[in-house]
Amino acid sequence: MASVAAAAVSVPSFSGLKAETKAAPARLSSTSVVRMAPVVRASASSDALKTVGKALLAASSSLLLVASANAATVKMGGDDGALGFYPKDISVAAGESVTFVNNKGFPHNVVFDEDAVPAGVKTEDINHEDYLNGPNESFSITFKTPGTYEFYCEPHQGAGMKGVVTVS
């Protein structure tokens, strides 16, 4: 029968002590395989970055042109069915367009008051007297002459469906 003897062990305190670790040297056997990461030439990498940079520049320039071509969008009628233009006050630069979109499907149009447009502007050139009857029907007007343009919806003018475009 085997006997087990117990021994008293004292454990020192390790507060403030730092353990030192050393890695054992690696040993390779004759059958070890070493793989190396692929090497990328700096010029190939910078050429790729230049190409990506040019593509991003072209894409952002295109977006800016699209954004300036459609400077503002005005909903004809509110999301809740209210009669109005949203927003009712619009500011654009000369040469920019405003797109009017029928929001809910009530018949709407846009008529400019001939006494409330800049001198020399012919309202018949910018009025859209035909009704937009369906949701998402739209048209755009490009404003060339700086000034203030007051407009309204003919069937809903009495309900306060009016707006102003300010062209700088």
UniProtKB/Swiss-Prot annotation:
CC per GO annotation:
chloroplast thylakoid membrane
Residue interval of the organelle targeting sequence: 1-70
Its record classes its membrane topology as: Peripheral membrane protein
Instruction: State where the protein is found.
Output: Plastid, Chloroplast thylakoid membrane
Give a GO molecular function annotation for the protein: electron transfer activity
Gene3D superfamilies in alphabetical order: Cupredoxins - blue copper proteins
Task: Tell me the function of this protein.
Answer: Participates in electron transfer between P700 and the cytochrome b6-f complex in photosystem I.
What is the protein's name according to its record? Answer: Plastocyanin, chloroplastic
Q: What is the species listed in this Swiss-Prot or TrEMBL entry?
A: Physcomitrium patens (Spreading-leaved earth moss)
